[in-house]
Amino acid sequence: PDEDDARTGTPFHSYWLGKIGNAQIGPIYLGKLGFLSLVCGLVAFEIIGLNMAASVNWNPIEFLRQLPWLALEPPLPEHGLSVMPPLNEGGWWLMTGFFLTTAILLWWVRMYRRAVQLGMGTHVAWAFAAAIWLYLVLGFIRPVLMGSWSEAVPFGIFPHLDWTAAFSIRYGNLFYNPFHMLSIVFLYGSTLLFAMHGATILAVGRYGGEREIEQIVDRGTASERAGLFWRWTMGFNASMESIHRWAWWFAVLCPLTGGIGILLTGTVVDNWYLWGQEHGIVPSYPEVYTPAVDPAKGG
């Protein structure tokens, strides 16, 4: 279309890339949205990197050594939902969040528009939207509902993992959160379905099983053999078309249910362990021994 930009780059081929996929590299369509997305993402990445470098006094050796532990922390609790806290007390984090979120949303619009322009369905864009939902819950929606940006996740490799562990402990163990349970079911289920489907197609590759579109509309010996295998081993088989719907929904429901579970934590449920006891998920154990006294609290 006239409003679109030209594709960029001259296509070339890679022998080694051909071993794992299509050997052709390029051209790529970036467009205005893609360009703006990359610019915003670069700004966010730069703010994070410079703040981490400043935290080690601009020492490049210490920066590389401590990189997994460095963080850009959200605003302090006393700043609440202020949109202009001091830069060194969370202002940089807010600025980073703005640019990173803008980059992600622009990239989503770009993916959606490319799919429409190519006459495809928009399944990839909506799957990406499920991941964006979880990202927004963690960094924007839940902190707003809790009334403080300090509830959000820090930027950093180990710091965000530490935040996850502390978050679970603070709210009585997320393992008892039913939506967390569902999220894990869909996470493990996705890997299982992917492994089953990938293994099946490889197993019938000698019969042209990789030509899945043909097999969907005109089932051949590859589909028949694959179907027989699964009926013989577990009594049921998906079709060449339905397995992709199974995989798509399992993958999408992982971040969707996870986001719901995070959103309910602290806003609706303060302690998932006690909630589980009240609803028959967690057994209530009787006190058999006298509780031990913490020596650190002794006089």
Language-model segment annotations:
Residues 2-111, 158-160, 168-184:
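Transmembrane alpha-helical insertion/packing segments
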Residues 55-84, 143-174, 212-232, 271-299:
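Membrane-interfacial helical/loop segments at transmembrane boundaries in membrane proteins
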Residues 52-57, 109-122, 141-154, 188-212, ...:
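Juxtamembrane/interface segments at transmembrane-helix termini
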Residues 3-16, 43-46, 222, 226-228, ...:
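Long, low-complexity, intrinsically disordered extramembrane tails
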Residues 75-95, 111-142:
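Cytosolic-side membrane-entry/anchor segment at the start of a transmembrane helix
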Residues 9-25, 56-67, 72-76, 100-127, ...:
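Cytoplasmic membrane-interface regions of multi-pass membrane proteins
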Residues 36-53, 125-147, 185-192, 253-263:
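Hydrophobic alpha-helical membrane-insertion segments
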Residues 18-41, 118-128, 171-185, 227-260:
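Loop-to-transmembrane boundary segments
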